[in-house]
Amino acid sequence: MARCQKVDIAAQELLGVRMYDLRVRFDRHKKPIICHGLMEYETINLDSWLELMNRTYDHYMRVVLETTRPDQKQEIEFILFCGTLEHKYPNIKFFGGNNRSDWSCQNPIYDFKQKLPQIDHKYSSTTTLFPNAPAWLTRIDDLYPYLYARLHNKQNYANPTPNRWLMLDFVNIH
Protein backbone atom coordinates (compact mmCIF):
# COMPACT_ATOMS: atom_id res chain seq x y z
CA MET A 1 0.00 0.00 0.00
CA ALA A 2 1.01 3.63 0.11
CA ARG A 3 4.22 4.42 -1.80
CA CYS A 4 4.84 0.79 -2.68
CA GLN A 5 1.82 0.90 -5.00
CA LYS A 6 0.79 3.42 -7.63
CA VAL A 7 -2.79 2.21 -7.91
CA ASP A 8 -5.52 2.40 -5.29
CA ILE A 9 -7.05 -0.55 -3.45
CA ALA A 10 -9.93 -0.94 -5.94
CA ALA A 11 -7.48 -1.20 -8.85
CA GLN A 12 -5.32 -3.65 -6.89
CA GLU A 13 -8.39 -5.81 -6.31
CA LEU A 14 -9.08 -5.83 -10.07
CA LEU A 15 -5.48 -6.93 -10.63
CA GLY A 16 -6.12 -9.91 -8.35
CA VAL A 17 -4.45 -8.71 -5.16
CA ARG A 18 -5.78 -10.56 -2.12
CA MET A 19 -2.91 -10.12 0.33
CA TYR A 20 -1.93 -6.78 1.79
CA ASP A 21 0.80 -5.42 4.01
CA LEU A 22 -0.31 -3.05 6.79
CA ARG A 23 2.47 -1.28 8.65
CA VAL A 24 1.70 0.93 11.61
CA ARG A 25 3.22 2.84 14.47
CA PHE A 26 1.43 5.03 16.98
CA ASP A 27 1.53 8.74 17.68
CA ARG A 28 1.71 10.26 21.16
CA HIS A 29 -2.11 10.18 21.33
CA LYS A 30 -2.07 6.41 20.66
CA LYS A 31 -3.57 6.89 17.21
CA PRO A 32 -2.34 4.41 14.57
CA ILE A 33 -0.24 5.91 11.81
CA ILE A 34 -0.11 4.02 8.51
CA CYS A 35 3.50 4.12 7.43
CA HIS A 36 6.37 2.45 5.63
CA GLY A 37 9.84 3.21 6.87
CA LEU A 38 10.10 6.94 7.40
CA MET A 39 7.05 7.74 5.26
CA GLU A 40 3.67 8.32 6.92
CA TYR A 41 0.29 8.35 5.17
CA GLU A 42 -2.57 10.33 6.65
CA THR A 43 -5.00 10.15 3.73
CA ILE A 44 -5.79 6.45 4.00
CA ASN A 45 -9.23 5.61 5.40
CA LEU A 46 -8.26 2.35 7.06
CA ASP A 47 -11.74 1.46 8.31
CA SER A 48 -13.42 1.73 4.91
CA TRP A 49 -10.62 -0.29 3.31
CA LEU A 50 -10.89 -3.05 5.93
CA GLU A 51 -14.70 -3.06 5.80
CA LEU A 52 -14.52 -3.65 2.05
CA MET A 53 -12.14 -6.59 2.51
CA ASN A 54 -14.17 -8.00 5.38
CA ARG A 55 -17.15 -8.51 3.04
CA THR A 56 -15.37 -11.46 1.43
CA TYR A 57 -13.44 -14.39 2.85
CA ASP A 58 -10.40 -14.39 0.59
CA HIS A 59 -8.18 -11.62 1.97
CA TYR A 60 -4.98 -11.93 3.96
CA MET A 61 -3.32 -9.04 5.72
CA ARG A 62 0.13 -8.97 7.25
CA VAL A 63 0.25 -6.50 10.16
CA VAL A 64 3.67 -5.15 11.15
CA LEU A 65 4.75 -2.71 13.84
CA GLU A 66 6.92 -0.32 11.86
CA THR A 67 9.63 0.36 14.43
CA THR A 68 13.22 -0.77 14.22
CA ARG A 69 13.96 -1.11 17.92
CA PRO A 70 11.97 -2.34 20.92
CA ASP A 71 9.56 0.23 22.32
CA GLN A 72 7.24 -0.95 25.08
CA LYS A 73 4.65 1.82 24.56
CA GLN A 74 4.48 1.10 20.82
CA GLU A 75 4.19 -2.63 21.50
CA ILE A 76 1.31 -2.18 23.96
CA GLU A 77 -0.62 -0.07 21.45
CA PHE A 78 0.18 -2.59 18.71
CA ILE A 79 -1.23 -5.46 20.79
CA LEU A 80 -4.46 -3.51 21.39
CA PHE A 81 -4.65 -2.53 17.71
CA CYS A 82 -4.19 -6.12 16.49
CA GLY A 83 -6.83 -7.42 18.91
CA THR A 84 -9.26 -4.79 17.64
CA LEU A 85 -8.56 -5.75 14.02
CA GLU A 86 -9.32 -9.42 14.69
CA HIS A 87 -12.52 -8.62 16.55
CA LYS A 88 -13.83 -5.97 14.15
CA TYR A 89 -12.90 -7.73 10.88
CA PRO A 90 -13.32 -11.48 11.47
CA ASN A 91 -13.36 -12.42 7.77
CA ILE A 92 -9.86 -11.09 7.09
CA LYS A 93 -7.06 -13.56 7.75
CA PHE A 94 -4.56 -11.47 9.69
CA PHE A 95 -1.01 -12.69 10.23
CA GLY A 96 2.34 -11.28 11.22
CA GLY A 97 2.07 -9.38 14.47
CA ASN A 98 5.78 -8.77 14.35
CA ASN A 99 8.13 -5.84 14.61
CA ARG A 100 9.72 -4.69 11.37
CA SER A 101 13.06 -6.13 12.51
CA ASP A 102 11.63 -9.66 13.05
CA TRP A 103 10.60 -10.90 9.59
CA SER A 104 10.93 -14.51 10.70
CA CYS A 105 8.01 -13.94 13.12
CA GLN A 106 9.75 -16.19 15.64
CA ASN A 107 8.78 -13.86 18.49
CA PRO A 108 5.68 -11.95 17.41
CA ILE A 109 4.45 -9.10 19.55
CA TYR A 110 0.89 -10.25 18.84
CA ASP A 111 -0.04 -13.83 17.96
CA PHE A 112 -2.85 -13.85 15.40
CA LYS A 113 -2.93 -17.66 15.59
CA GLN A 114 -3.35 -17.63 11.83
CA LYS A 115 -1.04 -20.05 10.08
CA LEU A 116 1.55 -18.01 8.24
CA PRO A 117 0.87 -18.29 4.51
CA GLN A 118 3.71 -19.42 2.30
CA ILE A 119 4.95 -16.20 0.72
CA ASP A 120 7.39 -15.42 -2.04
CA HIS A 121 8.90 -12.14 -0.88
CA LYS A 122 9.76 -10.61 -4.24
CA TYR A 123 9.11 -7.02 -3.50
CA SER A 124 12.43 -5.47 -2.65
CA SER A 125 16.04 -6.08 -3.39
CA THR A 126 17.51 -6.42 0.09
CA THR A 127 14.71 -8.43 1.66
CA THR A 128 14.65 -10.79 -1.31
CA LEU A 129 18.36 -11.19 -1.85
CA PHE A 130 19.58 -10.72 1.72
CA PRO A 131 16.94 -11.89 4.24
CA ASN A 132 19.25 -11.10 7.17
CA ALA A 133 20.37 -7.72 5.86
CA PRO A 134 21.48 -5.16 8.43
CA ALA A 135 18.95 -2.48 9.38
CA TRP A 136 20.80 0.31 7.53
CA LEU A 137 20.62 -1.63 4.27
CA THR A 138 16.87 -2.27 4.59
CA ARG A 139 16.33 1.45 5.26
CA ILE A 140 18.15 2.32 2.04
CA ASP A 141 16.05 -0.26 0.25
CA ASP A 142 12.85 1.45 1.45
CA LEU A 143 13.80 4.34 -0.82
CA TYR A 144 13.99 2.24 -4.00
CA PRO A 145 11.07 -0.23 -4.24
CA TYR A 146 9.91 1.28 -7.55
CA LEU A 147 13.26 0.65 -9.20
CA TYR A 148 13.26 -2.95 -8.01
CA ALA A 149 9.71 -3.43 -9.33
CA ARG A 150 10.65 -2.00 -12.75
CA LEU A 151 13.60 -4.36 -12.99
CA HIS A 152 12.07 -7.55 -11.58
CA ASN A 153 8.24 -7.64 -11.56
CA LYS A 154 7.85 -9.00 -15.09
CA GLN A 155 10.09 -11.96 -14.26
CA ASN A 156 8.49 -12.43 -10.83
CA TYR A 157 5.00 -12.54 -12.39
CA ALA A 158 6.19 -14.98 -15.06
CA ASN A 159 7.93 -17.34 -12.62
CA PRO A 160 5.88 -17.60 -9.42
CA THR A 161 6.72 -20.31 -6.93
CA PRO A 162 3.91 -22.92 -6.93
CA ASN A 163 1.65 -22.95 -3.88
CA ARG A 164 2.97 -19.65 -2.55
CA TRP A 165 1.56 -16.15 -2.36
CA LEU A 166 3.52 -13.64 -4.42
CA MET A 167 4.04 -10.31 -2.63
CA LEU A 168 5.12 -7.46 -4.88
CA ASP A 169 5.48 -3.72 -4.76
CA PHE A 170 3.83 -1.83 -7.62
CA VAL A 171 1.53 -4.66 -8.74
CA ASN A 172 0.56 -2.70 -11.86
CA ILE A 173 4.11 -3.05 -13.25
CA HIS A 174 4.40 -6.36 -15.09
Describe each model-derived feature in a short phrase.
Residues M1-H174:
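Catalytic cores of phosphodiester-bond hydrolases, prominently lipid phosphodiesterases
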